[in-house]
């Protein structure tokens, strides 16, 4: 039986990764079908267990990923790592601490923000000011995607005009990875772009996902003009 997970995320985010790969290939003039096959091969190697590999084969690569589906967290991480290896090469960075140093994982999050602002979360973006979106809609999106418990640990504090600090407590969550934080940086950056913010900068100055972290809290410093 394919492995299941008690901790899942909304399938639209995973669907967005596939659409990001398609868009990336189009922008770079790559053969999408061949690239997807290479990513699939790499993902199956990275799956870690036969059960997870079977899940990827049957539910992710062979089935239809619906926006309303719930998909285990680990699927996203495996796909992001496989995509980075294929598109950027073995050893390419999987994470970043700043929007000023974008990685492929950052760009995947950024792409999803722009896409979802025009699709599944259009009402949560429409007519919002950046600070209004960060304090309300951003939390609502995470609640929708990751559940009430995760979203209840969010703290969004205004630190000045065009300056917000976001604290996310990952305690009790499935083992987190800096890749997750990088997609969050990208999502925040893309959302601010969509909302018309000028010169947005997202810095992840405290990360609870790195090995040896004393706590599970992640802090994102967000500024714009």
What do the PLM-derived regions correspond to, one by one?
Residues 25, 192-193:
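Residue-level preference for well-ordered alpha-helical positions
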Residues 51-183:
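Amphipathic interaction/junction segments at domain boundaries or subunit interfaces
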């Amino acid at each position: 039986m394919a492995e299941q997970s008690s901790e899942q995320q909304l399938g639209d985010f995973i669907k967005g990764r596939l659409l990001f790969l398609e868009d990336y290939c189009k922008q770079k003039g790559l053969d999408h079908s061949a690239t997807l096959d290479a990513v699939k091969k790499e993902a199956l190697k990275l799956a870690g267990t036969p059960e997870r590999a079977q899940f990827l084969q049957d539910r992710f690569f062979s089935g239809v990923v619906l926006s309303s589906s719930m998909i285990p967290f680990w699927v996203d991480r495996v796909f992001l790592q496989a995509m980075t290896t294929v598109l950027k090469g073995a050893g390419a960075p999987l994470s970043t601490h700043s929007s000023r140093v974008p990685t492929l994982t950052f760009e995947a999050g950024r792409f999803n923000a722009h896409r979802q602002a025009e699709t599944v979360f259009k009402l949560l973006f429409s007519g919002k000011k950046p600070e209004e979106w960060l304090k309300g809609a951003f939390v609502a999106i995470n609640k929708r995607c990751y559940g009430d418990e995760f979203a209840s640990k969010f703290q969004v504090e205004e630190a000045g005009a065009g300056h917000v600090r976001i604290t996310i407590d990952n305690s009790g969550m499935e083992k987190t990875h800096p890749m997750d934080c990088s997609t969050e940086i990208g999502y925040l950056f893309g959302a601010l772009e969509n909302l018309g913010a000028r010169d947005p900068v997202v810095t992840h100055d405290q990360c609870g996902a790195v090995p040896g972290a004393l706590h599970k809290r992640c802090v994102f410093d967000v500024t714009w003009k």
